[in-house]
């Protein structure tokens, strides 16, 4: 009996040829929480099946850690059932009996740390994803099916190496894309259509997102494919990418998406036509490209304590529709700058407030880009989230800086 667990809710006109379609977003479905990811739909189906068969559904609890990873990495709302799944999965993840998952946590030194949703979304998830992006998803699948600890360790290390390669490829792609982006922006393009012929198609969307974040312009990154060129786009508030693509659909051989992201394929000869038409139709104005940052409270770093950070952790897990609180401090003195990381993209600032409080601030950004912004300035105004940094058994207060600009004395 074929099943289809279509959680995306996109199939509105034609149902797939299955005896059962499990989709909580169907109009006729009265399931109370329709925002599950695919793994969540499958998990709740298994629970219902166990209950119907009068089996002990506690046997499914071992899967909660995997479900937490899927829920965070699928970027669904962390509300309702999703929030419970992630919270329970995080609570159990260090006790997992899955040899492959344990190996993946160990290779990132996570077993000795408190694991939160950030680790799932930005450390564990990308490693799993890198397998499918650069090779085959089979490697990640085999890791979680592995019963031999040594083989699991080896596969986990291979996945980490693949993800490190993906990071390097992404950084190189971003640098190349930025060069083009600045050029087209200077010419007056509002929508940045960037062509990177050597870019691996699986990271085009990541690069487009980075360009969008950096310049706050809608951005497409296209690369060579077997037939023509293909790529992905990422948008900003106020610009529905899919609707705008519909207006120039004649240039594509295939396209799809939603307001904030899209994918497309086209003949290489149509590239310039696409760039020209998408910009001619664009009604965005200069004010639309100004980055808007909403903070929760203007709070000097002098108020940060270990106890405050522990209290904030009650709000975890953070993610879509349950974002971390964002704080701000105006005018911190930058006493020292240190740069770390293989790609020189981890910036550590020694900061001092006007009241004399000293604290480290972390910025994850290319060194050249950071130093260009800083110039000779000595003071920084920033938004941040406070964390506890653990290193060799020593704990210290630290802020992770989200947005910033430099100010004069």
Regions found by a protein language model. Name each.
Residues 19-21, 33-34, 40, 189-193, ...:
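Structural motif
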Residues 40, 205, 209, 382:
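Short alpha-helical basic/polar micro-motif
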Residues 1-7, 200, 258, 346:
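Histidine-centered active-site/metal-ligand motif
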Residues 2, 21-23, 68, 221, ...:
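Structural signal for conserved beta-strand scaffold positions within catalytic alpha/beta enzyme cores
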Residues 51-276, 298, 340-341:
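Hydrophobic helix-and-loop "lid/oligomerization" segment in the mid-to-C-terminal part
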Residues 15-17, 214, 356:
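Short, well-ordered coil/turn elements that cap or connect secondary structure elements
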Residues 80, 151-155, 161-195, 247-409:
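Mid-to-C-terminal polyanion-binding domains and interfaces
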């Amino acid at each position: 009996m074929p099943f289809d667990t279509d959680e995306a809710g996109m199939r509105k006109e034609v149902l797939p040829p299955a005896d059962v379609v499990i989709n909580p977003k169907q109009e006729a479905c009265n399931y109370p929480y329709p925002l599950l990811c695919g793994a969540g739909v499958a998990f709740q189906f298994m629970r219902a099946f166990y209950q119907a068969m009068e089996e002990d559904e506690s046997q499914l609890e071992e899967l909660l850690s995997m479900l937490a990873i899927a829920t965070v990495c699928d970027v669904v709302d962390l509300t309702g059932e999703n929030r419970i799944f992630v919270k329970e999965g995080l609570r159990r993840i260090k006790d997992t009996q899955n040899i492959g998952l344990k190996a993946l946590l160990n290779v990132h030194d996570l077993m000795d740390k408190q694991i939160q949703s950030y680790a799932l979304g930005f450390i564990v998830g990308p490693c799993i994803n890198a397998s499918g992006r650069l090779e085959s998803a089979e490697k990640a699948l085999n890791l979680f099916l592995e019963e031999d600890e040594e083989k699991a360790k080896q596969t986990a290390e291979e996945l980490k190496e693949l993800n490190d390669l993906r990071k390097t490829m992404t950084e190189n792609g971003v640098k190349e894309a930025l060069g083009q982006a600045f050029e087209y922006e200077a010419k007056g393009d509002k929508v940045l259509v960037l062509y990177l012929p050597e870019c691996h198609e699986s990271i085009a969307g990541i690069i487009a997102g980075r360009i969008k974040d950096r310049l706050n312009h809608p951005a497409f990154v296209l690369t060579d494919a077997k037939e023509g060129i293909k790529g992905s786009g990422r948008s900003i508030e106020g610009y529905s990418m899919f609707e705008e693509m519909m207006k120039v659909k004649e240039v594509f051989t295939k396209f799809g998406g939603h307001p904030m992201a899209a994918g497309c394929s086209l003949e290489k000869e149509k590239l310039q036509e696409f760039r020209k038409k998408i910009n001619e139709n664009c009604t965005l104005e200069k004010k639309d490209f100004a980055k808007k940052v909403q903070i929760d409270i203007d709070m000097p770093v002098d108020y940060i304590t270990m106890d405050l950070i522990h209290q904030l952790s009650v709000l975890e897990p953070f993610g879509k529709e349950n974002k971390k609180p964002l704080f701000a401090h105006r005018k911190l003195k930058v006493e020292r700058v240190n740069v770390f990381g293989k790609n020189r993209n981890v910036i550590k600032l020694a900061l001092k407030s006007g009241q004399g409080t000293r604290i480290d601030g972390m910025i994850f950004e290319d060194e050249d880009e950071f130093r260009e912004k800083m110039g000779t300035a000595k003071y920084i105004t920033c938004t941040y989230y406070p964390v506890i940094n653990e290193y060799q058994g020593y704990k210290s207060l630290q802020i992770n800086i989200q947005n910033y600009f430099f100010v004069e004395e």
